[in-house]
Amino acid sequence: MDKRHDPSRRIIAPTGTELSCKSWLTEAPLRMLMNNLHPDVAERPEDLVVYGGIGRAARDWECYDKIVEVLQRLEEDETLLVQSGKPVGVFKTHNNAPRVIIANSNLVPHWANWEHFNELDKKGLAMYGQMTAGSWIYIGSQGIVQGTYETFVAMAKQHFNGSSAGKWILTGGLGGMGGAQPLAGTMAGYSVLTCEVDETRIDFRLRTKYVDKKATTLDEALAMIDEANKSGKPVSVGLLANAADVFAELVERGITPDVVTDQTSAHDPLNGYLPQGWTLEQAIEMRKTDEAAVVKAAKQSMAVQVKAMLALQAAGAATTDYGNNIRQMAFEEGVENAFDFPGFVPAYVRPLFCEGIGPFRWVALSGDPEDIYKTDAKVKELIPDNPHLHNWLDMARERIAFQGLPSRICWVGLKDRARLALAFNEMVKNGELSAPVVIGRDHLDSGSVASPNRETESMLDGSDAVSDWPLMNALLNTASGATWVSLHHGGGVGMGFSQHSGVVIVADGTDDAAARLGRVLWNDPATGVMRHADAGYDIAKNCAKEQGLDLPMLEKATTEGK
């Protein structure tokens, strides 16, 4: 019997103000754990899989049930420890300590590879937490929409004189992360052709309005893109096809998109990427009987796709790796120049990270969309001079369907996170919001990740692989009073290639919450500014000085420079 598979389970988070736990500080992680497994949120909720190949919310259903049970009895001065999706201990702490501390899929570096992890996984000794799956703050594809949108806008500025009109994007993958691309692309003014091998994923994205149209042949998809470009009305098309096949065929035909990227689950060659010529059913069976053959075939197909991406780049396409480690997989398969196209962070996002700007998000525990709309208005009120941000909030309200509990993603930085959170807390206190909100972020943030093929690629000082930073981030957030803190390995790019930390905090309208919010949501983005200032980025150094950060070695460097 598979302890992870139970098709009878249908998990829906409670809403409203009635508590099933002893306080909002334990009710919040309970609801967010459940929300991660909502049928409109998770990719395979019956298997506890939230997104990203096998990114899970709990190790198995027995562990899930026990986590729920413990959260419902947890006292306000106790902390639950969750080890790779398994609740392993409850300890007396204090009321400003985290209620939950999570560690997922962390391995001693010598053994930090998929082969060793998969052995542990099969024995029921580990769980892949991805980033926000195992840390209980996934909000569906909206969680990556704005970051993807910001990247595509930056690409238009850098490559197309600021205009995406008549331009189109070629990409792959419509899973939990990749599913954001078509909507983000059309919001940024491009048409988007996304290849996906699983028709149910295309249909899901159609239903949730992340994709406009479905095509079953490349000719049909290209005709849709061509018509959209001629009419000036961007369209997103989900093409039922293998990305490696399509990318290579476009090279053969001499058709060059304006932008090329990919967000298949290439980080996990066993569970996340379908080899060319294989059916989904064939892959599922082969994973049970010959893992090595699946991995080899998947990497060979990735090599084909990356070679095509390089050829399209040479033909003039703006080409970028969108953080799934496909370049590394192709490199291991003999594509020596796989890294000739850049990752999206060093190419387009790092200046934002230097100011602590990243994917700030919040969720209405009430379940009432009006609570999110009221917070949208509060963000506009408190940040009145940012038309780009206002435009994002307007588009998000108009075009993004909530998945599970209503939520919002909003890229803001050190200057704004704490004051927004304190304003939300005041709105809970005075009754403007009908229930508390939880505030968190992706692990993809400025100070919370070490990932040499993604967030920390090509750091100015060569410190790409130094992972002290996310460890310090997690420890500082714990000391600052976050509601739950997580420390993961392998998210985004796979085993052996990243370490990263997450933080979530509850705004319940109390004075104690205000004190915690002020500490956590200042310190958390400040570690990102610190990390980039330490690496030598002038934007970060200037931000640190402007915001009065106490960075002893930066102060020394400034003094020496006088």
From Swiss-Prot:
Cofactor: NAD(+)
Keywords: Cytoplasm, Histidine metabolism, Lyase, NAD
UniProt keyword annotation of Ribosomal protein present: no
InterPro entries the record matches: Urocanase (IPR055351), Urocanase-like (IPR023637), Urocanase_C (IPR035401), Urocanase_central_sf (IPR038364), Urocanase_CS (IPR023636), Urocanase_N (IPR035400), Urocanase_Rossmann-like (IPR035085), Urocanase_sf (IPR036190)
Gene Ontology biological-process annotations: L-histidine catabolic process to glutamate and formamide; L-histidine catabolic process to glutamate and formate
One GO location term (cellular component): cytoplasm
Catalytic activity: 4-imidazolone-5-propanoate = trans-urocanate + H2O
Biological pathway: Amino-acid degradation; L-histidine degradation into L-glutamate; N-formimidoyl-L-glutamate from L-histidine: step 2/3
Record EC number: 4.2.1.49
Gene Ontology molecular function: urocanate hydratase activity
Cofactor note: Binds 1 NAD(+) per subunit.
Active site: C410
Function statement: Catalyzes the conversion of urocanate to 4-imidazolone-5-propionate.
Family (UniProt): Belongs to the urocanase family.
The protein's name: Urocanate hydratase
